[in-house]
């Protein structure tokens, strides 16, 4: 069984599921009706409070448990019955392009776990799985693959994947990667959230959550006072301006280049990017699951090329 998981610092995505990269661990069920997993005699529930940024997600067990949630949600979606017989899984994952060479081997082994059988309970259902193969792909390029039919018409374009903590930038020529520009910057929307929250607390003694900031950026109804809203908008515009200048220093001029924006951060910032009129040709990949779906397309292409099943 093929299961594709995009491990974001802000959220976990499969082709069909989306949830925050946050966990609470306890010794027993808490009595609330929430998704849970019992594994290794511990209970894990999802929370909207995301995990602090980890450049190397193999440092502890949390992203492994989040992956069990992702697998369980896909099994549930596909109506796979609970079973004590191990389900063999080929797991498709991704990493920022600039981190790929350094981290991909460790990342794959983290999930492979010597192909051991893993038993767990998900929302009262019992599953047994064995991750028999793990394949990793570059994020951003995977998202671009889902739009290859459109991108191959452009002689040069830049895919800009704005995630939770990283922004990945990849140059494309006729839809194919040009390794002259492969960058991953630790300047994702979590850094914006942290900056806004810190300044708001200092100036107005208010504690903001990510969702409070999202409401203002998206022009949604909010209970925040006007001065806080203005602070959020000003700092978000400054964040984008700084990012555009950062790109320009690296040879990417958004005022003259075709820029293809992907990732949840791009969708969050879309309105401000478009209203700012600093990006001449913005194209948005609206599917937040694009990387996860792209891993599947890349895997299918490899299978077809190798004549494997």
Predicted regions mapped to residue ranges:
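Nucleotide/phosphate-binding catalytic cleft detector across ATP-hydrolyzing
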Residues: 1-157, 176-191, 211-309
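Active-site-proximal alpha-helical scaffolds that flank and shape metal-associated catalytic sites
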Residues: 160-164
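Short, acidic (Asp/Glu-rich) active-site segment that either coordinates a divalent metal cofactor
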Residues: 167-171, 181-182
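Acidic, metal/cofactor-coordinating or nucleic-acid-engaging core segments within structured domains
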Residues: 200-203
């Amino acid at each position: 069984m093929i299961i594709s998981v995009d491990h974001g610092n802000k959220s976990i995505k499969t082709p069909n599921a989306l949830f925050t990269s946050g966990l609470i661990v306890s010794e027993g069920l808490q009595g609330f009706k929430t998704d849970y997993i019992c594994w290794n005699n511990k209970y894990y529930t999802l929370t909207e409070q995301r995990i602090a940024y980890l450049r190397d997600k193999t440092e502890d067990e949390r992203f492994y448990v989040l992956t069990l949630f992702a697998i369980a949600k896909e099994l549930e979606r596909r109506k796979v019955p609970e079973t004590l017989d191990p389900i063999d899984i080929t797991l498709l994952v991704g990493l920022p392009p600039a981190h790929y060479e350094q981290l991909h081997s460790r990342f794959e082994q983290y999930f492979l776990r010597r192909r051991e059988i893993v038993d767990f309970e998900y929302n009262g259902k019992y599953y047994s799985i064995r991750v028999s193969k793990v394949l990793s792909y570059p994020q951003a390029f995977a998202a671009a693959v889902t739009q290859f039919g459109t991108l191959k018409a452009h002689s040069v374009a830049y895919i800009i994947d704005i995630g939770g903590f990283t922004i990945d930038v990849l140059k494309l020529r006729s839809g194919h990667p040009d390794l002259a520009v492969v960058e991953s910057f630790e300047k994702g929307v979590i850094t914006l959230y942290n900056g806004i929250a810190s300044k708001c607390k200092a100036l107005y003694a208010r504690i903001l959550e990510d969702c409070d900031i999202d409401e203002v950026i998206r022009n949604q109804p909010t209970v925040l006072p006007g001065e806080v809203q203005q602070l959020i908008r000003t700092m978000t515009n400054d964040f984008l301006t700084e990012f555009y200048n950062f790109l320009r220093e690296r040879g990417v001029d958004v005022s003259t280049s075709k820029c293809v924006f992907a990732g949840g951060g791009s969708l969050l910032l879309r309105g401000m990017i478009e209203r700012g009129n600093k990006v001449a040709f913005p194209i948005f990949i609206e599917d937040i699951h694009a990387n996860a779906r792209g891993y599947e397309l890349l895997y299918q292409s490899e299978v077809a090329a190798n004549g494997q099943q």
